[in-house]
Amino acid sequence: GLVGEILFNRLDTMQAEIRATRHPMFDADKLLEQVRQFSELSAAVTKEIEVRRDGEWGQRLLKDRVQVGGVMDGFMDRAHKEVSIALPMQRGAGKSADFSKPVDAEKRDMAMRYVRLVVGSRNFAAAGSFGAKQKDASEELCFYLRRYNEDVVKEMRNGENRAIAETQFHFAIALTALLFSEEEAELMRRRGKAAQAAA
């Protein structure tokens, strides 16, 4: 009926807006809101109208969800790369954090946008058909950041590149607050102060 057609037109429009989003020019908050709305509306349509998967609307809805999921899978896949550019590790077997040269603010901003996407989509990733990728990205980022945090505190205590380490430390705290918790970020701040005092 007419209501169904209106709802599906709205879903198509939302899906098209999400598909038009590209790296590197994207607003994380806007994209999160678009995907959240799409996920909620598509879930509501499925539940309320009891869309049959094999029907015309069921196929349309499935197609829209697959396309939105594909876009978000791409962003989730790229998150680790962007964070590793902003929090670089040395090449080689040991792979400890690299403080040999400063990281520019644009790279940190890009990494922050990706982390906000990963964290911000946690509650609706499954409904948006990218739950597995979101979970993988989140776990990968958490593991990477824990390793980096250990190295940055060590560098602040007795490293040769303390000024670079301090800039990276503040950025790592911001990521820690997002990926873990504000409490974990506060613990990190205290460890940093202790490292500076011991330097």
Outline where the language-model segments fall.
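Extended alpha-helical scaffold segments
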Residues: G1-M156, A163
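Short amphipathic alpha-helical coiled-coil/interface segments
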Residues: V35-F38, F169, G192
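Beta-rich interaction/scaffold domains
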Residues: G58, L62, L178-A199
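Extended alpha-helical scaffolding segments
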Residues: L141-R190
